[in-house]
Amino acid sequence: MTFPTLPAPIAAALEERGYAEATSVQAAVLQPEAAGRDLVVSAQTGSGKTVAFGLAMVPELLRGEERIGFVQSPLALVITPTRELALQVSRELEWLYARTGARVATCV
């Protein structure tokens, strides 16, 4: 499955990283019926879960815009069970949202 229409900065980040099409995990979280819902995903390492997680936040974070304007409080909070996973999520979100003006902070 190819990626659905995404804001240009997100699409460019995916293309730069070599993502030509969505993995099955990414496709599942991008389905319209998943929008705004809490999701539980279980899949093998390397299946694209972390990027899927970042893509699922696009509508809420960008709200149809290409950049995130100045905000005084966090727009999202990601809690992980381990330090290593927190750092992995942070790295993935940083490149995925780099062109949007988003700032990613990690507390471990």
Predicted regions, residues:
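The conserved Walker
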Residues: A43-S47
